[in-house]
């Protein structure tokens, strides 16, 4: 896994390798690593490690599907400038893992260095990954750089969610962060990729925010995998589009078909409840159509 990480996060990905020696001494260096295997009907954790600020929790089993529900916990409450944290997970053949977080990912004000978070997830043959962290909240003056890279083996399916708030909305702090850079890259077995990149610098480049400025939440959901029939994708496309139309004026979005097998949902929302309710409806539809599984109530645990 160490070798894969070095290859995945090369100098062209947000130019991480260009950090100076001074910057390397600032902030925390935290790493969280998981390895999952199939044991009978269940997915089990076979290997793990973590360093501060990450805290390790073993997976839970909330239903009889065998899915390993795994929480990513940062007890420090967020990231500060100079922090460089990473998450790695290897899902072996036939496993099913859901990775989420118990609270929002807060990014605090920084004078110069960004907070960096790198995620690399490898999904084995016929494995299922659900990446559903809570929203990222960049505080005023914060700088954050995130990359999420997912590698899919034949028959693997990934559901990848990413959402960002305009700031501390309850404090009337909107689009006041210094910079947010984000990259999501999902690689398919045949060598294709689904990639989303953006850089938001509200103070210098108002056009980098554009029409999104009047909304408080921006979200993306990727559902990618070659194990799903084309008819299922078509049906799910219609269902997801209908969900986005249920909150006119509160949610605005669309469903698109990428070059890889799957769907991409992009939407903006007025409030946190609008964001959460839309995600839960979309997630429920995806689980039902792809795997005939209900959505667990993660908030109870």
Question: What do these predicted regions represent?
Answer:
Residues 162-301:
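A structural signal for small-residue-enriched, beta-sheet-centric alpha/beta enzyme cores
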Residues 139-147, 152-178:
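Acidic (Asp/Glu-rich), glycine- and aromatic
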Residues 81, 111-113, 140-142, 153, ...:
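Short, contiguous, pocket-lining structural segments
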Residues 29-33, 67-68, 84-86, 116-118, ...:
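Broad gene-expression machinery/nucleic-acid interaction feature
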Residues 54-58, 108-113, 141-143, 169-173, ...:
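A short, polar/proline- and glycine-enriched secondary-structure boundary/capping micro-motif
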Residues 91-93, 101-103, 123-125, 133-135, ...:
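Short, structured patches in soluble enzyme cores that scaffold and shape functional sites
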Residues 8, 12, 19-136, 140, ...:
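N-terminal, charged/glycine-rich beta-strand/loop interface patches
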């Amino acid at each position: 896994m160490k070798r894969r990480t070095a290859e995945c996060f090369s100098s062209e990905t947000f130019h991480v390798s260009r950090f100076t020696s001074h910057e390397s001494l600032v902030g925390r260096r935290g790493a969280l690593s998981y390895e999952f295997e199939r044991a009978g009907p269940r997915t089990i954790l076979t290997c793990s490690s973590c360093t501060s600020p990450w805290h390790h929790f073993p997976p839970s089993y909330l239903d009889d599907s065998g899915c390993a529900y795994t929480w990513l916990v940062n007890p420090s409450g967020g990231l500060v400038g100079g922090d460089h944290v990473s998450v790695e997970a290897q899902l072996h053949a036939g496993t099913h893992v859901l990775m989420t977080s118990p609270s929002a990912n807060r990014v605090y004000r920084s004078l110069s260095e960004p907070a960096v978070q790198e995620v690399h997830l490898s999904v084995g043959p016929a494995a299922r990954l659900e990446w559903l962290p809570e929203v990222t909240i960049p505080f005023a003056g914060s700088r954050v750089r995130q990359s999420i890279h997912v590698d899919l083996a034949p028959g693997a399916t990934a559901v990848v969610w990413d959402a960002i708030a305009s700031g501390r909305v309850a404090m009337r702090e909107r689009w006041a962060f210094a910079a947010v850079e984000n990259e999501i890259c999902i690689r398919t077995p045949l060598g294709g990729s689904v990639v989303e990149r953006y850089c938001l610098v509200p103070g210098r480049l108002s056009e980098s925010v554009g029409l999104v400025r009047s909304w408080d939440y921006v979200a993306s959901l990727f559902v990618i995998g070659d194990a799903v029939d084309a008819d299922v994708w078509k049906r799910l496309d219609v269902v997801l589009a209908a969900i986005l139309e249920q909150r006119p004026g509160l949610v605005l979005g669309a469903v698109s078909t990428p070059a890889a097998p799957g769907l991409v949902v992009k939407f903006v929302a007025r409030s946190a409840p609008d964001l959460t309710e839309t995600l839960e409806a979309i997630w429920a539809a995806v689980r039902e159509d792809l795997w005939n599984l209900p959505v667990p109530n993660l908030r109870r645990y």
